[in-house]
Regions:
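Beta-hairpin "wing" of winged helix-turn-helix
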Residues: 69-78, 85
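N-terminal helix-turn-helix DNA-binding core of bacterial DNA-binding proteins
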Residues: 15-56, 82-91
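Alpha-helical residues within the helix-turn-helix
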Residues: 51, 62, 68-69
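Divalent metal-coordination and catalytic microenvironments
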Residues: 60, 67, 84
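Amphipathic alpha-helical dimerization/coiled-coil segments
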Residues: 1-16, 34-38, 88-119
Length: 119
């Protein structure tokens, strides 16, 4: 095996990266995540997410749990409601992990990637 790949496989971040990617590798979870990213810091109650995505609340609950466990979204109780929001720090960390070894750490080789994460 090549040394670079060996380093990546031994990286303690590999498991966390895979957890984040696996959480997004399903249609309802990806749509939920994108909806929460669009809602900015305000977040959304589970019922509103369910309505927006036309997904049964009990089905959505399992997906919200997976996204929460991955760290990509956060949940906060506000009265009787659970408010879900994107964890932008975790998103930035995931994106950085994906590109940190890109182009042999030569930024000039990754011009397009320099635009990642800029809104």
């Amino acid at each position: 095996m090549k040394p670079l790949l060996e380093d990546l496989e031994r990286s303690p971040d590999l498991s966390a990266t895979l957890t984040g990617l696996n959480a997004l590798a399903q249609e309802i979870r990806l749509k939920t995540f994108r909806l929460l990213m669009a809602s900015e810091k305000d977040g959304m109650p589970a019922g509103m997410i369910s309505s927006e995505l036309d997904v049964a609340p009990n089905k959505l609950s399992a997906h919200l749990n997976i996204l929460t466990q991955s760290g990509l979204i956060e949940v906060e109780r506000q009265g009787r409601h659970m408010i879900y929001s994107a964890n932008t720090d975790a998103v930035a960390t995931l994106l950085n992990r994906l590109v940190e070894t890109c182009c042999h750490n030569d930024p000039s080789l990754c011009e397009e990637l320099s635009k990642v994460g800029k809104c």
